[in-house]
A protein has these predicted regions:
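Acidic-glycine-rich active-site phosphate/pyrophosphate-binding loop
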Residues: 22-42, 108-113
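Short cysteine clusters
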Residues: 17, 54, 102
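Phosphate-handling active-site elements
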Residues: 28-38, 66-85
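C-terminal binding/interaction regions
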Residues: 82-145
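Mg2+-dependent prenyl diphosphate-binding active-site environment of isoprenoid biosynthetic enzymes
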Residues: 20, 57-69, 80-83, 91
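Glycine/serine-rich anion-binding loops at beta->alpha junctions
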Residues: 43-62
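Short glycine/serine- and small hydrophobic-enriched flexible loop segments
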Residues: 23-27, 62-69, 138-142
Length: 145
């Protein structure tokens, strides 16, 4: 099974989008899996169920930071490389899906309780979100890992 499939499977088992992506790669990047799940937890639902940046995207951005992020103030090269890789990731995800915003991707504003209920009833979390998790992981592997 590919790592992208593993991330998708993690999501389908019940992990939120951001933890599903980040935890799939965390141990290879030096972060304990349970800690990765905790760190990424608040990023689900477009960051705290606000419908903003997709959790699958933020999970991948955190993985990019773990792999290439700046570790001290003098390390400007790592910071700039991280920015470049994040931009490349976002460009590729946007090319595939038209946006990185959760509410644009799923068609519901999760910050609105009525729309959240409608989203759940529609099955969007089962029908669309696994694909976003899979694509985020696949793009992450293509450009970073």
């Amino acid at each position: 099974m590919s790592r992208a499939e593993e991330a998708k499977q993690q999501f389908e088992k019940g992990f939120l989008c951001a933890p599903a992506v980040l935890s799939t790669y965390s141990e290879q990047l030096g972060l304990e899996k349970t800690l990765a799940v905790k760190i990424a937890c608040g990023f689900g639902g477009g960051i705290g169920r606000t419908g903003r940046t997709c959790g699958a995207v933020t999970g991948a951005v955190m993985a990019i930071g773990l792999k290439h992020g700046q570790v001290n103030l003098a390390d400007e090269e790592s910071r700039l490389r991280t920015y470049m890789l994040v931009k490349e990731f976002i460009d590729k995800f946007t090319t595939l899906h038209g946006s990185i915003e959760c509410k644009d991707l799923i068609g519901y504003d999760l910050s609105n309780s009525g729309e959240l209920r409608s989203a759940r009833e529609s099955g969007v979390f089962q029908n669309k979100c696994p694909g976003f998790v899979y694509d985020s992981a696949r793009i992450l592997e293509d450009i970073v890992l």
